[in-house]
């Protein structure tokens, strides 16, 4: 069966927002109006179509990006629902990587919020074209102009309204379309399915003319012909104006701002029109870069069915009916069921068992898919998030890897029975495969299973899934901080390992220079020996020895990070030297760093933002200071005060309850990992005593 939709008619986009901006409701309405959903699901009653895990329906937040296909005006929309809670930033990064465009949803009452900034920065990183939908315009206190201002102030983005609301709060009746210079008014019944064009109300005409002129001036800058005509006194036609706005969106010159209320069914169809008119098709974005699997040279893949197959796995989910599902974006080529694929990232073979087109919670089996498609594959064995799948025979490729932040919080889990132990192993392996920001390891000394994640909520939800989905009974320890260690100074260490008492002995001498590296540089090993002081075949033993001990640290058993080890000299013995002897020597040299390298304990520092009513400001700041917080600044947002601070993660456990109690539930906070920094000596002494 040939391709049914031209690739230029695809819109692969995501909906991104702060936690309560109404993102899931907006997605629900899109599915309803595009005819995919027969009943509107409300987050308020836990029935939203996209939020299909129990944990999401209860908490009213979106945890996993479900991918859905829908149609609007002959265009094919692949919608990726992204979570808005900061503990799930990884999901957002991962979906932005495979999107071509995005709709940023703002709460018309709050404007740009902390998580909006985070997600916006991530979208900047991946250069994702976006449009903005100011939602909840029916809420008391909603203010469109203020929201637009907050985009300019807080995101530093050029915001250009292409609509503004008619009426506000409970009297919201529609919007002014500044491209067509018409009013669009919705009937209150028929669930928002009926709307009509009217002339712009007389009392809004002056505002509309001014806003239209601002839009036109920004738009014609994108096109020389339009600019010339405009300077000559000619008003651009609707088609020319749309073409210019589209150009601006594709290069990020400005961001069109739309408005409405998804909950009250107003403004969603005009948002869909804007998605079709302004967001990119796969042909509008730069070709995808990759590395040739064999030659390791850079190659590009254009969005075309004729090019060799290249597919990126961006999400793995455990589905109760199908088993493990791998969500994939096809960048080039054609994929068919039964095909044999190469996982180029891991050099493993895979076979496509079933291929599914997902609609949030039901699925359609398909036999083939093309460039631009987002599909779910069942039956893959070794593929993980971020892996590339391709045709083993036609110029295999590795697409660029996704980068995932390191987890900062950990808890110990102990199964209650032998049966639980077995179930726990299987369940954790699946959860770790689904989510790269969640890692599982075993503490060799205590034998405990350690789970690491991005925040308390992140781990809470994993524990919840273990208990509910996998029926594992386990005891959960208190959360622990993922401390790290670093070197305080550069030091040369000369160590000789010698065991020569009859028979084959062991001999290895290493001279290694250890030095602190830049933050984020990781562990770097270098061999600078010139000549044959240590034969080449023994060098890997030196590196292996260091690799085997660095994660146990020097002070309290935490990994030593960001340092460089340079092998500068050494000695060997013709008979008694071996790879193992050099491994033992480098391990012993490493241990001498405890005395000689001035090691330091590091702790994760979180960027914390608290939004609080004025009357609790003193208590909030006092409390943050008592947690070793460093206040970075404060400003006003509406009638609330925003406090920004850096606070050690160790002092943030249980903060949500303290803040709630202190402000009678009116203050909110978000936090995310920012950097590691040395722990003050008196605190370090306590930590070392506890863990060493």
From Swiss-Prot:
Subcellular location(s): the record lists: Cytoplasm
Q: Which family does it belong to?
A: Belongs to the TRAFAC class translation factor GTPase superfamily. Classic translation factor GTPase family. EF-G/EF-2 subfamily.
User: Can you name one GO molecular function term for this protein?
Assistant: GTP binding
Report the Gene3D superfamilies cross-referenced here: 3.30.230.10, 3.30.70.240, Elongation Factor G (Translational Gtpase), domain 3, P-loop containing nucleotide triphosphate hydrolases, Translation factors
Q: Which organism is it from?
A: Caulobacter sp. (strain K31)
Question: Which named protein is this?
Answer: Elongation factor G
PANTHER family the record matches: RIBOSOME-RELEASING FACTOR 2, MITOCHONDRIAL (PTHR43261:SF1), TRANSLATION ELONGATION FACTOR G-RELATED (PTHR43261)
The gene that this protein is the product of is fusA
**Annotated GO CC locations:** cytoplasm
**Organism domain of life:** Bacteria
């Amino acid at each position: 069966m040939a391709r049914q939709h031209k690739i230029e008619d695809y819109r692969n986009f995501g909906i991104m927002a702060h936690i309560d901006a109404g993102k899931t409701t907006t997605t629900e309405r899109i599915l309803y109006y595009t005819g995919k959903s027969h009943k509107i699901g409300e987050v308020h009653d836990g029935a939203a179509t996209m939020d299909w895990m129990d944990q999401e329906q209860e908490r009213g937040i979106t945890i996993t990006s479900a991918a859905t296909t829908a149609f609007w005006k002959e265009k094919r929309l692949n919608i990726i629902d992204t979570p808005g809670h900061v503990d799930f930033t990884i999901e957002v990064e991962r979906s932005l990587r495979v999107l071509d465009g995005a709709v940023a949803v703002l709460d018309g009452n709050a404007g740009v919020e902390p998580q909006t900034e985070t997600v916006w920065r991530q979208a900047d990183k991946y250069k994702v074209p976006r449009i903005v939908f100011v939602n909840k315009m029916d809420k008391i206190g909603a203010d469109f102009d203020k929201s637009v201002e907050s985009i300019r102030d807080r995101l530093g983005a050029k915001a250009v309204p292409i609509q503004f609301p008619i009426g506000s709060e409970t009297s919201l009746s529609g919007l002014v379309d500044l491209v067509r210079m018409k009013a669009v008014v919705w009937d209150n019944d028929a669930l928002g399915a009926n709307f009509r064009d009217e002339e712009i109300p007389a009392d809004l005409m002056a505002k509309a003319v001014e806003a239209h002129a601002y839009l036109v001036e920004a738009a014609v800058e994108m096109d020389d012909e339009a600019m010339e005509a405009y300077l000559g006194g000619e008003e651009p036609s609707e088609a020319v104006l749309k073409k210019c706005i589209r150009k601006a969106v594709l290069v990020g010159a400005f961001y069109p701002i739309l408005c409405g209320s998804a909950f009250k069914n107003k403004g969603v169809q005009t948002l869909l029109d804007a998605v079709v008119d302004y967001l990119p098709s796969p042909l509008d974005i730069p070709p995808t870069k990759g590395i040739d699997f064999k030659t390791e040279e850079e190659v590009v893949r254009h969005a075309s069915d004729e090019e060799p197959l290249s597919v990126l796995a961006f999400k793995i989910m455990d589905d109760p009916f199908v088993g493990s599902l791998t969500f994939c974006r096809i960048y080039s080529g054609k994929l068919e069921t039964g095909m044999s694929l190469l996982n180029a990232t891991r050099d493993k073979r895979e076979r496509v068992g079933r291929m599914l087109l997902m609609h949030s919670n039901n699925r359609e089996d398909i036999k083939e898919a093309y460039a631009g498609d987002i599909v779910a594959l069942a039956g893959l064995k070794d593929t993980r998030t971020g892996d590339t799948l391709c045709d083993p025979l036609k110029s295999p490729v590795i697409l660029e890897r996704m980068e995932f932040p390191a987890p900062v919080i950990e808890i110990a889990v102990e199964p209650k029975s032998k049966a639980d132990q077995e179930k726990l192993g299987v369940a954790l392996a699946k959860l770790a495969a689904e989510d790269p920001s969640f890692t599982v390891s075993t503490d060799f000394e205590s034998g405990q299973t350690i789970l690491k994640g991005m925040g308390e909520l992140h781990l809470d939800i994993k524990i919840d899934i273990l208990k509910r989905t996998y029926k594992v009974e386990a005891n959960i320890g208190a959360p622990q901080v993922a401390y790290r260690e670093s070197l305080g100074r550069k030091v040369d260490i000369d160590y000789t390992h010698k065991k020569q008492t009859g028979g084959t002995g062991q001999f290895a001498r290493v001279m290694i220079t250890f030095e602190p590296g830049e933050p984020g540089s990781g562990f770097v090993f270098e061999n600078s020996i010139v000549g044959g002081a240590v034969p080449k075949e023994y060098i890997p033993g030196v590196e292996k020895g260091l690799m085997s001990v660095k994660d146990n640290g020097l002070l309290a058993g935490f990994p030593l990070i960001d340092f460089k080890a340079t092998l500068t000299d050494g000695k060997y013995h013709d008979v008694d030297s071996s790879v193992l002897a050099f491994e033992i020597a480098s391990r012993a040299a490493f241990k001498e760093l405890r005395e000689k390298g001035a090691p330091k304990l590091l702790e994760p520092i979180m960027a914390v933002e608290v939004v609080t009513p004025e009357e609790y400001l003193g208590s909030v700041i006092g409390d943050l200071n008592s947690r070793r917080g460093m206040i970075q600044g404060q400003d006003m947002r509406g009638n609330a005060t925003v406090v920004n601070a850096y606070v050690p993660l160790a002092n943030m456990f249980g903060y949500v309850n303290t803040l709630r109690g202190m402000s009678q539930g009116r203050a909110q906070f978000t936090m995310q990992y920012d950097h590691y920094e040395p722990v003050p000596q008196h605190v370090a002494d306590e930590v070392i005593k506890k863990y060493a």
